[in-house]
């Protein structure tokens, strides 16, 4: 993509993403500045490209994390419930936490990262604690092990849901866990085929509207047996 680049450090990377119009809001830029990718990506943390993090999983490119924050930012408010499916390294989950915390403190806020690989769950918690132990200690950011394709009913309904891997078709179970006024963004399409980042918005009456945002290429949303 035209904006792909390598930052000298985390702040330089965020500056470049902002200069190229990938990051539009100061609040998104600040959340990403405060969440240094070096804690979450052992290889090339400031390169704008996916990087391996173990278990056959990659951390998404920084520009895709920026897009996710921009598309969801109006739903990231104190007291909101957020679900990050396929949370992997824990990076974007931490960005959600910091974005909301900067808006104000509310005891009802819950940001849940769900990951199906036990080792990645362990590693992401270690990443978060290396970054800032107070995030997990707050009880408002949770990392859980489970099949994210089924969402996480204990904290539903969610004001915002992000999915970090491609669903083969419309993710009905996740849509069912959206709150009224909530938004889901998810890559949809077959592995190796045409995929699109799709946005699902649920209105006050439960009606869902889908908007196709852009063409993407993601690994498929799976479980350990896939």
Curated annotation (Swiss-Prot):
GO terms for biological process: defense response to bacterium; methylation; protein modification process. GO terms for cellular component: cytoplasm; cytosol. It catalyses: [protein]-L-isoaspartate + S-adenosyl-L-methionine = [protein]-L-isoaspartate alpha-methyl ester + S-adenosyl-L-homocysteine. Pfam families: PCMT (PF01135). Monomer. Its main location: cytoplasm. S-adenosyl-L-homocysteine binds at residues 57-60, 65, 89, 115-116, 147-148, 222. Its EC number is 2.1.1.77. It comes from the Eukaryota. It comes from Drosophila melanogaster. The active site is at residue 60. This is Protein-L-isoaspartate(D-aspartate) O-methyltransferase. The gene is Pcmt. Transmembrane segments: none annotated.
């Amino acid at each position: 993509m035209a904006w792909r680049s390598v930052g000298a450090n985390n702040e330089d990377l965020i500056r470049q993403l902002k200069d190229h119009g990938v990051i539009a809001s100061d609040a998104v830029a600040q959340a990403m500045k405060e969440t240094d990718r070096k804690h979450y990506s052992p290889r090339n943390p400031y390169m704008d490209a996916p990087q391996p993090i173990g278990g056959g999983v990659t951390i998404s490119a920084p520009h895709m994390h920026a897009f996710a924050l921009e598309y969801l930012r109006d739903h990231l408010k104190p007291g909101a419930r957020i679900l990050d499916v396929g949370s992997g390294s824990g990076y974007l989950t931490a960005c959600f936490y910091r974005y909301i915390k900067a808006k104000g403190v509310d005891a009802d806020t819950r940001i849940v990262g769900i990951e199906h690989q036990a080792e990645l769950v362990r590693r992401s918690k270690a990443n978060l604690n290396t970054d800032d132990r107070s995030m997990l200690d707050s009880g408002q950011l949770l990392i859980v092990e489970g099949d994210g394709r089924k969402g996480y009913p204990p904290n539903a309904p969610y004001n915002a849901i992000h999915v970090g891997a491609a669903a083969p078709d419309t993710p009905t179970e996740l849509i069912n866990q959206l709150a009224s006024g909530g938004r889901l963004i998810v890559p949809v399409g077959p592995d190796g085929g045409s995929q699109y980042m799709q946005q699902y918005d649920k209105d006050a009456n439960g009606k869902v509207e889908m908007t196709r945002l852009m063409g993407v290429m993601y690994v498929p949303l799976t479980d350990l047996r896939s």
